[in-house]
Regions:
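Bacterial N-terminal signal peptides that target proteins for export
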Residues: 1-8
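Bacterial N-terminal signal peptides
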Residues: 9-17
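Sequence context of c-type cytochrome heme-c attachment sites
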Residues: 24-273, 287-324, 341-369
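Long, charged, low-complexity terminal extensions
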Residues: 26-73, 78-79, 106, 345-362, ...
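Cysteine-rich micro-motifs
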Residues: 189-191, 278, 379
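Glycine-/alanine-rich, low-charge beta-solenoid repeats
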Residues: 261, 278-281, 332
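Glycine-rich beta-alpha junction loops
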Residues: 285, 335-336, 385
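A conserved mid-domain beta-alpha-beta active-site/ligand-binding segment of alpha/beta enzyme cores
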Residues: 329
Length: 523
């Protein structure tokens, strides 16, 4: 390289450093936990993050119950970094250009998606003017090139011509390779090589969730450690029906890949900004966020007017320039203190399961600070007093639900302790390892043998794992029917009534049997 090119490259780096706040949206906590300075070079930041990302002692791998289960063929696509191996029939060499030429006929859907992506149209993006909503992506391409130059993948001043199949599936800049030996299914670290900023933001979820009273393990619940949460759930590891288990995995892949939100092979940011992008996982009996959002006034605004909004603009411009007049999952959960990032847990307060240990500590500074952050978020559309009053309503309503669960738990634990559950002393087989038997267990949704679980076990499990979650989620997403009597409170009351009835029935039966035994012994 000439001296002139070296000087120009250095000047460019200096100017960028002066005019652009480095890693502005990455929380301080990540740098503190990893022992890095905020102005660390992209290659340094990436290497340190990847080292932790792939460390089995810090959440990577198959989990502490790995000896209890074996992957099935589909597992290779859920956790490709652990299980994917290319088929033997792919043992031949390919070049960069041959990828598209061949797959145009074999898997045209892939190619069509890629041709519509930014990856396939870098020069088009570079030619945009400021009136185009995608103009900001020009800077992103430059940032990616700076990252790759820092890593030595690109030379100083060298530009990307296109991001093709081979760049993601064999290595950035590769011109050819063996279709079997060199082929990989990209994990999040592969995306992070180019998208260091976004990768770091997502990984910072581990660092911004330190629960003050240890209500949850550090860094959880989060997208960054979602696969760990999955494989270290006892019944997931212990159940024989691996195909059903992989259904759980399908919503726990965000730790492994980025395409849960940015679907391949277009990886559209506009698609990922819409609530439907979240809906595949954030729905159902224990986390029905999507349904509650859609039934809220926020969702009504989105449903009736969202097709008029400009989804190509970055989130921070959605309200002022994009015509957006109601929040989405993304504008609420990706925002913190006015900045938007791929860390979605910086304002988490109730976690993924309301519990007494949270309800009893909401006045702690940690929770209060996060509540203030929510008031700030809501105040983009509401007055601060309105926002605070609703958050107070949500907190108290959620705590009320927690109290009903606690009442049910006392009854169920007492029945279990006294051995009075149906068949408990005669027909209650142990659950699969590593699960331990208890009243109303989570494993009761995935295992049934003899009288384990009993009908009332399932009823109690529905209270704490489903009804209470729906109650909280409806409160949090402002769907009134969802926390009053369509779901939530009314179903909590109904199940609690059934548990109380069953408690009375079982205890009266036990007392009657005891009287019969006494009479028989007296004869």
């Amino acid at each position: 390289m000439s001296l002139r090119r070296s000087i120009l490259a250095l000047v460019s780096v200096i100017i960028t450093t002066i005019t652009t706040p480095l890693h502005a949206e990455i929380p301080d906590a990540l740098f503190e936990k990893l022992g890095l300075e905020r102005d660390s070079a992209p290659n340094v930041l990436y290497d340190v993050i990847v080292k932790r990302y792939r460390d089995v002692d810090q959440g990577a791998g198959e989990g502490k119950f790995s000896d209890l289960w074996e992957p099935i063929p589909f597992s290779a696509y859920m956790a490709p970094q652990y299980f994917y191996e290319a088929p033997e029939e792919l043992d031949f060499d390919v070049t960069r250009t041959e990828c598209v030429e061949c797959h145009q006929s074999i898997t045209p859907g892939w190619v069509h998606s890629w041709k519509d992506s930014v990856h396939g149209n870098l020069d088009e993006i570079r030619g945009l003017d400021e009136t185009d909503s995608r103009f900001y992506k020009k800077e992103m391409i430059s940032e990616v090139e700076t990252n790759l130059q820092s890593m030595g993948v690109l030379g100083d001043g060298e530009h990307l011509n296109v991001v093709g199949c081979i760049d993601c599936h064999m290595g950035v800049g590769a011109e050819g390779g063996n279709h079997q030996a060199d082929l990989m299914m990209p994990d999040a670290a592969a995306c992070g090589q180019c998208h260091v900023q976004e990768f770091a933001e997502r990984e910072s979820e581990r660092d911004t969730l330190d629960w003050p009273q240890d209500q949850w393990p550090a860094g959880r619940p989060s997208h960054a450690l979602s696969y760990l949460a999955n494989v270290e759930t006892g019944i997931w590891a212990g159940m024989e029906n691996r195909e059903i288990a992989e259904g759980c995995t399908m919503c726990h892949t965000t730790q492994n890949t980025c395409n849960s939100c940015h679907t391949r092979h277009e990886f559209s940011a506009a698609e990922a900004r819409k609530p439907e992008a979240c809906s595949t996982c954030h729905n159902g009996v224990d986390h029905n966020e999507f349904e509650n959002f859609m039934l809220s006034k926020h969702g009504v605004i989105y449903n009736t007017q969202g097709d008029e909004w400009d989804w190509e603009l970055p989130l921070e411009q959605a309200f002022e320039q994009g015509g957006q007049r109601g929040p989405t999952c993304q504008t609420c959960h990706m925002e913190s203190e006015g900045e938007y990032s791929h860390n979605l847990v910086q304002k988490v307060r109730w976690g993924f399961k309301p519990m007494p240990a949270i309800a009893e500590n909401l006045e702690h500074e940690w929770f209060e600070d996060r509540k203030s952050a929510w008031v700030s978020t809501c105040s983009q559309c509401h007055s601060p007093s309105f926002a605070e009053s609703y958050l107070d309503l949500m907190d108290q309503g959620t705590a009320d639900g927690v109290e009903l669960v606690s009442q049910a738990r006392v009854i169920m634990d007492s029945l279990y302790k006294d051995g009075l559950l149906t068949g408990q002393t005669t027909n209650r087989p142990s659950p699969p390892e590593p699960e331990k038997d208890e009243a109303g267990p989570f494993f009761g949704f995935f295992f049934s043998k003899g009288n384990n679980p009993t009908a009332i076990d399932v009823e109690f499990a529905e209270i704490w794992e489903q009804h209470n979650m729906k109650h909280f989620k409806a409160l949090a997403h402002v769907n009134p029917g969802g926390f009053t009597y369509s779901n939530g409170w009314a179903k909590l009351i109904r199940s609690l009534a059934r548990i109380r009835d069953t408690d009375t029935t079982l205890r009266e039966k036990a007392a009657l049997l005891e009287r019969i035994r006494a009479l028989e012994e007296a004869q």
